[in-house]
């Protein structure tokens, strides 16, 4: 059964303002579109987008009616106007009209060229103008429907992807005007969306509406081909999508299904497999002998002995005997509070200080109306002997009030708070959340023959210098562990320090009473040459040095023999040097001589080659000194206390109380607000310089004396080395908010050093860039933990 709908197409005369000469305004593209449209009108049967079983024909009569035939499913174009009401007559003459329409279409195709041209122009104008509910807009497919999308290959991996956003939810672009980006990084604008009326008209008028889908990547409408529709139908019906696939192909038996009965080995059973086991026979005979001798007991005997040990079992016949007594009594009775015991004031002969004077007696009588405000509910009296004590006049009243309290006052139990000890411990973050920090031993630098006392790292983090009791200074390459240079000295090397200024290559070596300024000759050659030029000539001093300074320290250039080793300047002190430290800029350095009394600490200026003694009096045995990283402050640590001096004003700023027996070392935070102190009495002290002069936190993490502590320059980490051969790495976060306390969390205990003569780890130092820590020990090694 077919239906025929007629659409009247009225060709309007073009308006005069839109007319233009054909020879000037028509372009090549317009001519091509007109030819395509004429070809589509002449050969409607060649359209590959029509579904099977749907015949569509064009009829061009003198009345300019356009007719379509459709099946019962309703796939036909809508109609404009009120014509086409004769549906039953068309059904009866459907076959005759089809033949007439074919003939009329061929004859009238030539006569309707002008009408087709006019129609193509109207279609172009309708595409350029926005659609309305009264006009039908032709749907232009996004691709050629006659061309199979994956005709050249069997996969969709090589399809033409115009939107490069990838496999993401496309609803992310709902709020934007574009839907993605093309290969030229230009926005793909969303096509205009019609309203419900436009969708309804398209559904009525477009015969391909049912096979049109929307591409979510580009927003364009794609017309499904016959092959796509056939594939969808096969999938919906539960069949295999590929039509060429044979589901019932003959089975090819690649491997045999018959069970092979031949054994892998056909060795006859041994004779001993048919005979009883000799070892089991011996075991059974031993058990029988043990049972006869009474050494071994049967299961029944063991159970009988257990029952005898338990004894008879008694139980209550009536369980209510005890519960009845409990029900008769008051549940959970609260005992009466006891009266306070008498004190010295209630004695018949109290001490004089408990007696009231005139003023106290007057105040006691004044509070007669408010007895609860009195200090005592009675007035103390003094008698010479117990015989003179009269009867207590308030005895009956107090007994009566006591009975009232017991009878009328409610009693309640005070619940004691059972606080778990773990609840009071502050909750610390997990060490996994505080990474990175060193966890394993990566390298061991071997080469020294005696204990290594000090270690220092180059500012760039490529080289390492170490000083040992074997009177040598070794320069190592950190990455490979190779010893690049060894410098021999005349005495034990107590301390080494690399200049923190990256523009200079200088190592300060404290050996005996001499301070050596060494050029290691590693790294950039221009930097090495610049350092030699700086230390080559001594500047002229305008200020005459004091005799007190001349007797304490002397500057001199190194001898030619020492020059070959790399030593450039030698600063000779009058006492053995224990520690040397640099200022952050690399021009000043300080030395400590514990035996120097009031000249124990000296400050040297490298550029002017002069020294100065900052203190005129000795306020204790100086152990170590330190420069502030930002401010012109100088930290001096004695055995028990730490003093902070202002170098500009030359005055004492603060004195830190450590409450320790002996200070071994200290390190300051890069921001300069927190100080870490190590002591020989197994403690580490954290000082908040803005908070108090007493330790903010005392950490007892080691079992022996703590020799050294060090802060990292970049990461919130600090490390400590002790004589228990352990290096403990901790997290120390200092916040910019002054109201928030520092966060201190112990992270890792690294214990790989060996103990030699009660000594363990002697010094620790951090890598300037990486979260790596170096440690020196009495086992003549330097160890790197990463």
UniProtKB/Swiss-Prot annotation:
Record InterPro entries: BOP1/Erb1, BOP1_N_dom, WD40/YVTN_repeat-like_dom_sf, WD40_repeat_CS, WD40_repeat_dom_sf, WD40_rpt
WD repeats: 447-488, 490-528, 572-614, 617-655, 658-697, 701-740, 756-786
BP term (GO), one: maturation of 5.8S rRNA from tricistronic rRNA transcript (SSU-rRNA, 5.8S rRNA, LSU-rRNA)
Keywords: Nucleus, Repeat, Ribosome biogenesis, rRNA processing, WD repeat
Annotated region (Disordered), positions in chain: 1-161
Biased composition range(s): Basic residues: 1-11
PANTHER family from the UniProt entry: RIBOSOME BIOGENESIS PROTEIN BOP1, RIBOSOME BIOGENESIS PROTEIN BOP1 BLOCK OF PROLIFERATION 1 PROTEIN
Function: Required for maturation of ribosomal RNAs and formation of the large ribosomal subunit.
Family: Belongs to the WD repeat BOP1/ERB1 family.
Protein name as catalogued: Ribosome biogenesis protein BOP1 homolog
């Amino acid at each position: 059964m077919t239906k025929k709908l007629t659409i009247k197409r009225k060709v309007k005369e073009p308006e005069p303002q839109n007319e233009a000469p054909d020879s000037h305004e028509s372009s090549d593209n317009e001519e091509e579109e007109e030819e395509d449209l004429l070809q589509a009108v002449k050969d409607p049967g060649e359209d590959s987008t029509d579904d099977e079983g749907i015949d569509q024909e064009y009829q061009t009569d003198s009345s300019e009616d356009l007719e379509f035939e459709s099946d019962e499913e309703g796939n036909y174009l809508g109609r404009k106007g009120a014509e086409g009401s004769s549906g039953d007559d068309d059904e009866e003459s459907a076959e005759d009209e089809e033949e007439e329409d074919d003939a009329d279409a061929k004859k009238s195709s030539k006569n309707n060229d002008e009408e087709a041209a006019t129609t193509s122009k109207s279609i172009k104008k309708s595409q350029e103008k926005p659609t309305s509910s009264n006009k039908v807009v032709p749907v232009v497919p996004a691709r050629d429907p006659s061309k199979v999308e994956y005709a050249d290959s069997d996969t969709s991996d090589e399809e033409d992807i115009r939107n490069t956003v990838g496999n993401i939810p496309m609803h992310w672009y709902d709020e934007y005007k574009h839907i993605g980006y093309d290969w030229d990084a230009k926005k793909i604008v969303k096509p205009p969306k019609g309203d419900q009326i436009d969708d309804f008209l398209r559904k009525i008028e477009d015969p391909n509406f049912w096979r049109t889908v929307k591409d979510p990547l580009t927003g364009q409408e794609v017309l499904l081909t016959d092959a796509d529709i056939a594939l969808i139908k096969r999938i919906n019906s539960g069949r295999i999508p590929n039509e060429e696939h044979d589901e019932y192909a003959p089975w090819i038996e690649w491997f045999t299904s018959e069970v092979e009965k031949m054994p892998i080995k056909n060795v006859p059973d041994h004779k001993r497999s048919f005979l009883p086991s000799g070892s089991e026979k011996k075991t059974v005979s031993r058990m029988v002998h043990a049972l006869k001798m009474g050494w071994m007991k049967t299961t029944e005997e063991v159970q009988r002995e257990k029952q005898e040990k338990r004894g008879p079992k008694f139980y209550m016949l009536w369980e209510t005997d005890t519960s009845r007594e409990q029900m008769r009594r008051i549940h959970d009775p609260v005992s009466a509070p006891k009266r306070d015991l008498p004190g010295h004031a209630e004695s018949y002969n109290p001490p004089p200080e408990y007696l009231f004077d005139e003023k106290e007696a007057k105040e006691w009588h004044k509070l007669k109306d408010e007895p609860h405000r009195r200090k005592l509910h009675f007035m103390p009296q003094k008698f010479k002997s117990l015989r003179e004590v009269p009867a207590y006049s308030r005895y009956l009243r107090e007994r009566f009030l006591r009975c009232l309290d017991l009878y009328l006052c409610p009693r309640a139990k005070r619940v004691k708070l059972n606080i778990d000890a773990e609840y009071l411990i502050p909750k610390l973050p997990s060490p996994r959340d505080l990474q990175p920090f060193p966890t394993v031993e990566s390298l061991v630098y071997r080469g020294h023959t005696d204990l290594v006392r000090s270690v220092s790292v180059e500012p760039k983090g490529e080289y390492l210098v170490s000083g040992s009791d074997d009177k040598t200074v070794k320069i190592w390459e950190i990455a490979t562990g190779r010893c690049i240079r060894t410098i021999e000295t005349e005495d034990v090397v107590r301390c080494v320090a690399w200049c923190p200024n990256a523009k200079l290559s200088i190592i300060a070596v404290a050996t005996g009473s001499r301070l050596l300024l060494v050029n290691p000759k590693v790294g950039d050659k221009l930097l090495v040459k610049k350092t030699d030029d700086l230390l080559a000539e001594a500047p002229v001093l305008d200020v005459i040095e004091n005799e007190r300074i001349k007797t304490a320290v002397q500057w001199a250039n190194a001898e030619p023999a020492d020059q070959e080793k790399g030593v450039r300047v030698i600063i000779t002190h009058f006492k053995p040097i224990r520690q040397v430290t640099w200022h952050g800029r690399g021009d000043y350095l300080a030395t400590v001589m514990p035996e120097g009394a009031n000249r124990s600490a000296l400050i040297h200026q490298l550029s002017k080659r002069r020294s100065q003694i900052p203190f005129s009096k000795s306020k204790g045995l100086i152990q170590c000194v330190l420069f502030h990283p930002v401010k012109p402050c100088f930290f001096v640590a004695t055995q028990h206390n730490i003093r902070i001096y202002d170098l500009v004003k030359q005055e004492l700023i603060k004195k830190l109380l450590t409450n320790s027996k002996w200070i071994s070392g200290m390190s300051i935070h890069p921001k300069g607000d927190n100080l870490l102190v190590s002591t020989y009495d197994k403690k580490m002290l954290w000082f908040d310089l803005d908070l108090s002069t007493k330790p903010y936190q005392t950490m007892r993490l080691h079992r022996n004396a703590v020799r050294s502590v060090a802060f990292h320059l970049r990461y919130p980490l600090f490390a400590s080395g002790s004589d228990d051969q352990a290096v403990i790495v901790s997290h120390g976060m200092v916040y910019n908010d002054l109201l928030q306390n520092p966060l201190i969390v112990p992270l890792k205990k690294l214990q790989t050093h060996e103990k030699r003569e009660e000594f363990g780890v002697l010094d620790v130092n951090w890598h300037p860039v990486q979260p790596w820590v170096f440690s020196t020990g009495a086992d003549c090694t330097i160890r790197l933990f990463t």
